[in-house]
A protein has these predicted regions:
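A short, structured loop/turn motif at beta-sheet edges
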Residues: 31-34, 58-65, 89-95
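Short, surface-exposed binding/anchoring microloops in extracellular/periplasmic proteins
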Residues: 20-53
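N-terminal signal peptide c-region/cleavage motif recognized by signal peptidases
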Residues: 14-16
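Bacterial N-terminal signal peptides that target proteins for export
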Residues: 1-6
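Edge beta-strands of extracellular beta-sandwich domains
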Residues: 107-117
């Protein structure tokens, strides 16, 4: 009985901690010429200037940054929200990138893998 309660409490604590991190919920990517544009939808419990989603990046699977979109202000009343980044150069032959969101308190959230077509 104690083990089940402890596991439940730990699971809830983990969920609460993760709920504060930004989450990418949708990505659309399009290629034009030699570069890509990404429209990324982020969900985060922005509370104001003290804690908000402050950016997201486009990365290769090895962690190499291809581009970064700074979010200059909180989106307290606009959740989830979508912002775009264009002119991202993706190396030839790469068919997968990872979008990683960031917030001003917890740092990076979980990556969202995108297959490029």
């Amino acid at each position: 009985m104690k083990t089940g309660v402890l596991a439940t409490v730990l699971g809830l604590m983990t969920g609460m901690a993760w709920a504060d991190s930004p989450v990418v919920t949708h990505v659309s990517a399009s290629k034009s010429g030699g570069s890509w544009s990404f429209s990324v939808t982020v969900k985060h419990g922005d509370t104001g200037w003290d804690h908000y989603a402050d950016g997201w990046g486009v990365y290769l699977e090895d962690g190499t940054e291809l581009g970064y979109r700074v979010l200059h202000h909180p989106h307290v009343d606009e959740q989830p929200f979508t912002r775009s980044l264009s002119s991202v150069k993706v190396p030839q032959g790469v068919d997968t990138v990872v979008i990683v969101p960031r917030d001003s308190v917890h740092g990076t959230g979980e990556g969202f893998t995108v297959k490029l077509r």
